[in-house]
């Protein structure tokens, strides 16, 4: 039970969301898809209002001197907004994850068991900066039959208010109750949200490791943690340098403020002398600050010396740490010690090295000969994602529709009783799968 005032405004919001979600859970796929189309259209119509709200957020954030990586995530230009709207449309085209029959089994003649997917209920999503996350999450929640309570960071309040206003306007002309999507905007509401175990079924915090731990320690609601992205790229001794250089540049500099950009480059000692000067030139052309261990400094004497803190830091900026390793085993040991189990990649032409890396690196996303920036629900074909889970238990990696449903067992009989199947003359079950 929650312990704070039953008259709390947030309680009332959560109750409305729960009620709306219970009706959404049984809506047809067609009705949900119509709602998603309406959301995309409403966002398109409100494009100018949303972009102006974001400009106001960015101006206020700039005046307050927020960190550069956070500012980059906050910015929502026309290109980002268009991509987010396309993502909504893509979610509408995906298969409905609700109502899937996972098990269809005859236990005995006339006694049939089914396991069928169903919505979780109400999601509580806490995120900072990225206002387009509200768009992605709302579309996924509706397609998966869930209500959602969004809690944005203070720096993105104006943007998210404009976005959620448009979403609710779109839903108002559909079978989906606009109360399905709610927005919270104050820090105090975060703590209140974490107490709503009676009304919220899953909390997804998107932020630092310390923030995710804070959430986990202050709620009885299950938590799906989206934490730091300390991602690594390992350049193996059998790497093709013509691939390794552009992949490194893309993984670091294409968009350094996101969680799937690399923070540490590990280089096999046998290829370091040839590879490092080339990649350093390419990275420095993109204004990336390089920090290296002692062995790296012998090859690149003009870069900054790396410290122990660098190996465990998510810069989310144009900074990259470099370490030379003696073997693939050393690279894997470094990744498993300092990484965040988000995304790590190997560049090599040796299949044995790939097999070793894939088998021993304990991360949600493990890549070969491609950029870590591909670790994304949209790029995986999920339409969008509510976050990237770095926990060991599923769902893991980019969490799309399939990660937002659970299942229930349904059994139909015809007067069957357990006594028939117990005792000395117990009847045997047939246990025959029907699908």
Swiss-Prot record:
Keyword Iron-sulfur part of the UniProt annotation: no
Q: Which Gene3D superfamilies match?
A: Aldehyde Dehydrogenase, Chain A, domain 1 (3.40.605.10), Aldehyde Dehydrogenase, Chain A, domain 2 (3.40.309.10)
Q: What is its EC number?
A: 1.2.1.41
Name the HAMAP family on file: ProA (MF_00412)
PANTHER family attached here?
DELTA-1-PYRROLINE-5-CARBOXYLATE SYNTHASE, GLUTAMATE SEMIALDEHYDE DEHYDROGENASE
- Pathway(s) served: Amino-acid biosynthesis; L-proline biosynthesis; L-glutamate 5-semialdehyde from L-glutamate: step 2/2
Taxonomic lineage of the native organism: Bacteria, Bacillati, Cyanobacteriota, Cyanophyceae, Nostocales
Primary role:
Catalyzes the NADPH-dependent reduction of L-glutamate 5-phosphate into L-glutamate 5-semialdehyde and phosphate. The product spontaneously undergoes cyclization to form 1-pyrroline-5-carboxylate.
Q: Which family does it belong to?
A: Belongs to the gamma-glutamyl phosphate reductase family.
Name the reaction it catalyses: L-glutamate 5-semialdehyde + phosphate + NADP(+) = L-glutamyl 5-phosphate + NADPH + H(+)
One GO CC annotation, please? cytoplasm
- Give this protein's Gene Ontology molecular function annotations: glutamate-5-semialdehyde dehydrogenase activity; NADP binding
* Cellular location(s): Cytoplasm
Q: Which UniProt keywords apply?
A: Amino-acid biosynthesis, Cytoplasm, NADP, Oxidoreductase, Proline biosynthesis
Query: What's the top EC group for this one?
Result: oxidoreductase
Asked if Oxidoreductase is a keyword of the record, the answer is yes
An individual GO BP term: L-proline biosynthetic process
Give the protein name, as stated in the record.
Gamma-glutamyl phosphate reductase
């Amino acid at each position: 039970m929650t312990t704070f005032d039953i008259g709390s405004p947030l309680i009332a919001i959560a109750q409305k969301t729960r009620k709306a979600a219970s009706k959404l859970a049984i809506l047809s796929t067609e009705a949900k898809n119509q709602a998603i189309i309406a959301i995309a259209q409403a966002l398109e119509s409100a494009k100018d209002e949303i972009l102006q709200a974001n400009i106001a957020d960015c101006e206020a954030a700039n005046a307050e001197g927020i960190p550069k990586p956070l500012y980059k995530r906050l910015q929502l230009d026309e290109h980002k907004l268009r991509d987010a709207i396309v993502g909504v449309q893509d979610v509408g085209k995906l298969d409905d994850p609700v109502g899937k029959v996972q098990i269809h089994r005859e236990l005995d003649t006339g006694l049939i068991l089914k396991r069928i997917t169903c919505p979780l209920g109400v999601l509580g999503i806490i995120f900072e900066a990225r206002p387009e996350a509200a768009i992605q999450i709302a579309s996924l929640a509706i397609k998966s039959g869930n209500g959602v309570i969004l809690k944005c960071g203070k720096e993105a309040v104006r943007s998210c208010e404009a976005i959620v206003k448009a979403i609710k306007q779109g839903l108002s002309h559909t079978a989906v109750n606009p109360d399905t999507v709610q927005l919270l905007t104050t820090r105090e509401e975060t703590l209140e949200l974490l107490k709503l175990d009676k009304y919220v079924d899953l909390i997804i915090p998107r932020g630092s490791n310390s923030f995710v731990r804070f959430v986990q320690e202050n709620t009885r609601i299950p938590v799906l943690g989206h934490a730091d992205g300390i991602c690594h790229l390992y350049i193996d001794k059998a790497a093709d340098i013509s691939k390794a250089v552009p992949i490194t540049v893309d993984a670091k500099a294409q968009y350094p403020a996101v969680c799937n950009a690399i923070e540490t480059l590990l280089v096999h000692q046998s290829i370091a002398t040839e590879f490092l000067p080339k990649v350093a030139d390419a990275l420095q052309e993109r204004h990336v600050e390089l920090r290296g261990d002692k062995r790296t400094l012998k090859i690149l004497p003009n870069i900054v010396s790396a410290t122990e803190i660098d190996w465990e830091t998510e810069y989310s900026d144009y900074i990259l740490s470099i370490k030379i390793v003696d073997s693939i085993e050393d690279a894997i040991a470094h990744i498993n010690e300092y990484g965040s189990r988000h995304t790590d990649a190997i560049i090599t032409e040796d299949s044995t090295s790939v097999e070793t890396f894939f088998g021993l690196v304990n991360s949600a996303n493990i890549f070969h000969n491609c950029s870590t920036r591909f670790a994304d629900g949209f790029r995986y074909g999920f339409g969008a994602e509510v976050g990237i889970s770095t926990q060991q238990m599923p769902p893991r990696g980019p969490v799309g529709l399939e990660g937002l449903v659970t299942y229930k067992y349904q059994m139909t009989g015809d007067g069957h009783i357990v006594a028939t199947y117990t005792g000395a003359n117990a009847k045997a079950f047939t246990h025959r799968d029907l699908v």
